[in-house]
């Protein structure tokens, strides 16, 4: 089955939402920081960006595919209780819609009340049968606040498997080999069995380029990446795994599913995310889109035990523990190394039981 209509709509929705998040950063973070008015604990720009991006994407999805349920991250309760924040979100949503150039007839939200109702349509419980979309409106909130990597992540799941993905990375250089001179902003998109492609975020006329992971066969030549936040994964154990594999260079640390996009185009070869708590369940919107990018670019994605990620059991990956992504040529070696290192650690033995 062709998913071209879904792919094109997903790219357009992610692009529109990315523009809104860039407005939020420039108006509410960059300017405030320059004026010394943004405190370290001020998370309001992320809140505004999250709600605005979710409203933009869901409104377009519901206009194009009204019967598809959506698993989103936010609901409107906070906005209904905070009218000032709601007004700011509504102002940015209106501004973004007015400047839209693609699918202009879609996502025409008429009021703040309609906007909040649309946000609430992301409350689907998930499941294994039929179609559903997953959305993370701003993945990597701390990266967003720092002006580093974050992502707008959208995926279509059919019968428990991701089949369409579009991930917007506004701060990822188009050419990772020339980060200082290459324009920032990409959208990475994939359709199952049809490859992974990189699009320019800001130049809609630029032809997409199919991307592939590096054909690395020796793990000592590979590059591995992990999240920035030490509390999100067992970084010490991950470093031990890298040493076991013969990797001598340090990890690339990056927030959000921009890591998956980077792997897909060959900027890295291995992504390790081992759980810090045995009971932690990864959210499906944090991995659905990114995992498909890597798989369509020549990689394999599983949990730390080599089990495929199961997106059909609700809003979380409750049947999995952690995440490992790697180029197919070295994937089994990475799983073997992970088993060798973690088998000695009671922390992970509890997970395996």
UniProtKB/Swiss-Prot annotation:
Its EC number is 3.1.3.7, 3.1.3.57. GO terms for molecular function: 3'(2'),5'-bisphosphate nucleotidase activity; inositol-1,3,4-trisphosphate 1-phosphatase activity; inositol-1,4-bisphosphate 1-phosphatase activity; metal ion binding; nucleotide binding. GO terms for biological process: phosphatidylinositol phosphate biosynthetic process; rapid tRNA decay; sulfate assimilation. Disruption phenotype: Deletion of this gene leads to sulfite auxotrophy. It is an enzyme of class 3 (hydrolase). Binds 3 Mg(2+) ions per subunit. Gene3D superfamilies: 3.40.190.80, Fructose-1,6-Bisphosphatase, subunit A, domain 1. The keyword Flavoprotein does not apply. One of its GO terms (cellular component) is cytosol. The active site is at 50 (proton acceptor), 141 (proton acceptor). Mg(2+) 2 binds at residues 136, 139, 286. Inhibited by Li(+) and Na(+). Mg(2+) 3 binds at residue 73. It holds the Pfam family Inositol_P. It catalyses: 3'-phosphoadenylyl sulfate + H2O = adenosine 5'-phosphosulfate + phosphate; adenosine 3',5'-bisphosphate + H2O = AMP + phosphate; adenosine 2',5'-bisphosphate + H2O = AMP + phosphate; 1D-myo-inositol 1,4-bisphosphate + H2O = 1D-myo-inositol 4-phosphate + phosphate. Its cofactor is Mg(2+). Keywords: Hydrolase, Magnesium, Metal-binding, Nucleotide-binding. AMP binds at residues 232, 256, 259, 273, 286. Mg(2+) 1 binds at residues 73, 136, 138. Adenosine 3',5'-bisphosphate binds at residues 141, 232, 256, 259, 273, 286. Belongs to the inositol monophosphatase superfamily. Phosphatase that converts adenosine 3'-phosphate 5'-phosphosulfate (PAPS) to adenosine 5'-phosphosulfate (APS) and 3'(2')-phosphoadenosine 5'-phosphate (PAP) to AMP. May regulate the flux of sulfur in the sulfur-activation pathway by converting PAPS to APS. Is also able to hydrolyze inositol 1,4-bisphosphate (Ins(1,4)P2) and inositol 1,3,4-trisphosphate (Ins(1,3,4)P3), but is not active on inositol 1,4,5-trisphosphate, inositol 1-phosphate, fructose 1,6-bisphosphate, AMP and ATP. Confers resistance to lithium. This is 3'(2'),5'-bisphosphate nucleotidase. It comes from Schizosaccharomyces pombe (strain 972 / ATCC 24843).
């Amino acid at each position: 089955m062709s998913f071209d209509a879904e792919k094109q709509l997903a790219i357009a929705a992610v692009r529109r939402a990315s523009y809104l998040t860039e407005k939020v950063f420039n108006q509410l973070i960059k300017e405030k920081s320059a004026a010394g008015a943004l405190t370290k604990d001020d998370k309001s720009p992320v809140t505004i960006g999250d709600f605005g991006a979710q409203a933009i994407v869901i409104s377009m999805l519901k206009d194009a595919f009204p019967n598809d349920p959506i698993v989103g991250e936010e609901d409107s309760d906070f906005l209904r209780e905070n009218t000032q924040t709601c007004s700011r979100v509504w102002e940015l949503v209106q501004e973004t819609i007015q400047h839209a150039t693609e699918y202009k007839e879609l996502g025409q939200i008429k009021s703040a009340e309609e906007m909040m109702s649309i946000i609430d349509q992301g409350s689907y419980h998930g499941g294994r049968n039929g179609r559903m979309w997953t959305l993370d409106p701003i993945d990597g909130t701390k990266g967003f606040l720092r002006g580093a990597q974050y992502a707008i992540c959208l995926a279509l799941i059919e019968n428990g498997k991701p089949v369409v993905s579009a991930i917007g990375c506004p701060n990822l250089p188009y050419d990772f080999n020339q980060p200082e001179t290459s324009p920032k902003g990409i959208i990475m998109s994939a359709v199952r069995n049809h490859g992974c492609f990189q699009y320019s975020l800001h130049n809609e006329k630029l032809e997409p380029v199919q991307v592939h992971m590096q054909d690395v066969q020796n793990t000592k030549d590979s590059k591995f990446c992990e999240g920035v936040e030490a509390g999100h994964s067992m970084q010490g154990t991950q470093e031990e795994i890298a040493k076991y594999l013969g990797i001598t260079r340090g990890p690339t640390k990056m927030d959000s599913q921009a890591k998956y996009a980077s792997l897909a185009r060959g900027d890295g070869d291995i992504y390790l995310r081992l759980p810090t708590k045995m009971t932690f369940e990864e959210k499906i919107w944090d991995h659905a889109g990114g995992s498909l990018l890597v798989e369509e670019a020549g990689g394999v994605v599983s949990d730390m035990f080599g089990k495929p990620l199961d997106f059909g059991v609700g809003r979380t990956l409750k049947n999995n523990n952690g995440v490992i992504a790697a180029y197919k040529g070295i994937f089994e070696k990475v799983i073997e190394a992970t088993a060798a290192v973690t088998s000695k650690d009671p922390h992970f033995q509890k997970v395996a039981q």
